[in-house]
Amino acid sequence: FAGYEMPLQYKNGIMSEHLHTRSHAGLFDVSHMGQVVLRGNDFKQTAKALETLIPMEVETLNVDRQRYGFFTNSNGGIFDDFMFSNRGDHIYMVVNASRKEDDIKYLRENLEPLGVSVRNLENRALIALQGPTSQRVLEEHFPKISKMRFMDVSTIPIAGAECWVSRSGYTGDDGFEISIPSQAAEIVTTSLLEHETVELAGLGARDSLRLEAGLCLYGQDIDATTSPVAAGLRWAMHTSRLSGGYKEGKFP
């Protein structure tokens, strides 16, 4: 997938992995996705720069909160969609694997002239723990994980590694996405798999779960010719950025 060798399924098969994620917890390796850090002199500068590329409010995003976003092109289509979070002194983004090279180039071309650096994090892995028991699994490593709300982001220790964790996912279920230093990825993953409710799940189940939840996949459901309104993504565009809003326009 996108030039990466990825497991479509493990020994129990797609259906089993799908159902297990819905009833317990599935663990997905999504390290092929792009992880990017945007950093200006401060968050406000970085946020204002990113707002020149997307129809979302960035400046009002609270510290340690995450938001869904997408780039638009000059024809009103979607260049790519992604997640972004306010980490205090920088913005952390997760972009699609199939688009990450284009996204990073686009960000550099447009943000670096505004004084914002764009760093591709090639030294971190990314996994997703999804399903109703995922909180219970992580509580064994960090009991306060239960205080995290949907779309909260925090830095927590798992198996001795400093991990960046968001309460979010691509399944429509409760879950967490976990960015791990590459050298600790195997240790952290193995530790989570030791929990009796956790099983590995592949790309097949990831696709069926997101379809069941009605979540878009770039390149299949949305692309550069699809408008956000036609895609049912009007909810993601903030009123302040649209016609008549106090920050209207000024994005492609």
PLM regions: where:
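Charged, low-complexity, helix/coiled-coil-prone segments
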Residues: 43-55, 79-86, 129-138
